[in-house]
């Protein structure tokens, strides 16, 4: 083989080796990004710090409550994993006591009344509800609101020792009254 051909082969192999080494450490843009993004909201209410971490499902034009989410069946208001509600101090939720701690949040949507459930099972996949782990169940009357495409939890009202935590998806708003103890 002539010296120029050998030099060309060596250069080509060296270039392939360099490209191979550089591509091993590169991050690919083809990584899967979940459609239901993780979100969290935190709020101080009196001496308590409250936080909820959840995955945000998206409506995408679907009929939600009474269709995609059946009435009168346990449902997780989070995708992938159950929402986690934590409080550093005991709370009164809808006038019922919830000890300080971490809880998974579940719901039983109804046409006129919803039940929100705080369970000691944490963390847990969003389809594995067990009523034996219930710590608190509260009944709430849902309200109608502007359309919210992506499920959200937020605090529309906060006072010195009380707050309202809203669960909002589609046109349904479920306001949860909280008082710090």
Report the location of each language-model feature.
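Short glycine-rich loop/turn motifs that provide flexible caps or phosphate-binding loops at active sites
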Residues: 24, 45-46, 94, 100
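Extended interaction regions within the primary functional domain
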Residues: 8, 79, 173
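Bacterial N-terminal signal peptides
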Residues: 15-25
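Mid-length scaffold segments of soluble, non-membrane domains
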Residues: 76-124
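Primarily secretory-pathway and cell-envelope proteins
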Residues: 28-73, 123-181
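Bacterial N-terminal signal peptides that target proteins for export
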Residues: 2-15
């Amino acid at each position: 083989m002539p010296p120029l051909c050998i030099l060309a082969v060596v250069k080509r192999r060296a270039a392939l080796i360099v490209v191979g080494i550089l591509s091993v450490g590169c991050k690919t843009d083809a990584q899967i990004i979940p459609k239901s993004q993780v979100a969290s909201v935190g709020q101080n209410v009196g001496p308590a710090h409250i936080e909820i971490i959840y995955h945000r499902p998206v409506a995408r034009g679907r009929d939600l409550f009474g269709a995609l989410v059946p009435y009168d069946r346990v449902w997780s208001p989070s995708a992938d994993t159950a929402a986690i509600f934590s409080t550093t101090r005991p709370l009164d939720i809808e006038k019922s006591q919830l000890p300080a701690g971490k809880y998974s949040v579940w719901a039983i949507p109804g046409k006129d009344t919803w039940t929100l459930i705080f369970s000691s099972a944490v963390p847990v996949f969003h389809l594995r509800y067990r009523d034996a782990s219930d710590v608190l169940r509260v009944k709430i009357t849902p309200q109608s609101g502007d359309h919210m495409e992506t499920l959200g939890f937020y605090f529309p009202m906060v006072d010195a020792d009380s707050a309202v935590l809203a669960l909002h998806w589609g046109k349904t708003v479920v306001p949860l009254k909280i008082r710090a103890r």
